[in-house]
């Protein structure tokens, strides 16, 4: 199965997919730089009178609901409609949907305008969308339960898409297949934007590789490996230094590293 992950990385480097991102103001620069680091081409286009047409030119669409304004909400409806009409992968990052009821209503409406290819959130967000009790604090998940796989599979079947829940162990499921990614570092929780960057990477990989399940696993593994390497560099235990090293290490993840250090449990 690791062969699929290396093929996904190769496809990303070869195709340089254009990722149309409508994301939050806190992490927009982080998302753009992470995409550039792995070889994708980010476009942070969110003007409502531009997104319908632009989404149809992209390799994938990334919708991040972190600081959702009314203008972004309208743009997201138009963008997902355009992307779905062209069969372009749509990646949803349902930031804070477990804490803010409006987010769940927005996600439901987005589902009327188009379809999701991947839903990527933390465990609390995934459980909230799946209709399960979730422990959250703002945008952060307090859940570390053993029902994460069940929540992912349930949500995947409900939406007919791939679902990924990030945490100490990342879970990826599509209603039939599932895996656990055991790489990563606590340092990723000490900077703003790691989750958003991971979501952006999922969009990048999905824009280059047809198997959305494999693309999602490859993206999250890339993020986790880069985090491990960033922590291991000089000063990597300091949040500011770690952030800078993280972007550097994203650019250095290759097939050999995935083969050597990737810890993926296929279920």
Swiss-Prot record:
Catalysed transformations (reactions): 5-(2-hydroxyethyl)-4-methylthiazole + ATP = 4-methyl-5-(2-phosphooxyethyl)-thiazole + ADP + H(+)
NCBIfam families: PRK09355.1, thiM
Pfam name, any one: HK
Keywords attached to this entry: ATP-binding, Kinase, Magnesium, Metal-binding, Nucleotide-binding, Thiamine biosynthesis, Transferase
Alphabetized InterPro entries for the sequence: Hyethyz_kinase, Ribokinase-like
Protein name: Hydroxyethylthiazole kinase
Reported cofactor(s): Mg(2+)
């Amino acid at each position: 199965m690791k062969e699929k992950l290396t093929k996904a990385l190769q496809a990303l480097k070869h195709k340089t997919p254009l990722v149309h991102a409508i994301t939050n103001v806190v992490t927009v620069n982080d998302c753009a730089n992470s995409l550039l680091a792995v070889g994708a081409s980010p476009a942070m286009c969110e003007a409502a009178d531009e997104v319908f047409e632009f989404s149809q030119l992209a390799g994938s669409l990334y919708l991040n609901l972190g600081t959702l304004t009314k203008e972004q909400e309208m743009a997201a409806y138009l963008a997902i409609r355009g992307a779905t009409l062209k069969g372009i992968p749509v990646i949803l990052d349902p930031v804070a949907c477990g804490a803010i009821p409006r987010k769940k209503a927005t996600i439901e409406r987005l589902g009327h305008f188009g379809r999701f290819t991947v839903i990527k959130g933390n465990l609390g967000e995934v459980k909230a969308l799946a209709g399960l009790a979730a422990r959250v604090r703002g945008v952060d998940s307090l859940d570390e339960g053993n029902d994460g796989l069940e929540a992912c599979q349930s949500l995947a079947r409900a939406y007919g898409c791939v679902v990924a829940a990030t945490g100490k162990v990342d879970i990826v499921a599509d209603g039939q297949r599932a895996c656990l990614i055991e790489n990563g570092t606590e340092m990723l929780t000490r900077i703003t934007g790691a989750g958003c960057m991971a979501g952006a990477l999922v969009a990048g990989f999905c824009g280059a590789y047809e198997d959305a399940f494999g693309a999602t696993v490859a993206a999250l593994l890339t993020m986790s490996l880069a985090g491990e390497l960033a922590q291991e560099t000089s000063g990597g235990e300091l949040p500011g230094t770690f952030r800078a090293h993280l972007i550097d290490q994203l650019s250095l993840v290759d097939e050999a590293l995935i083969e050597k250090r990737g810890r993926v449990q296929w279920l």
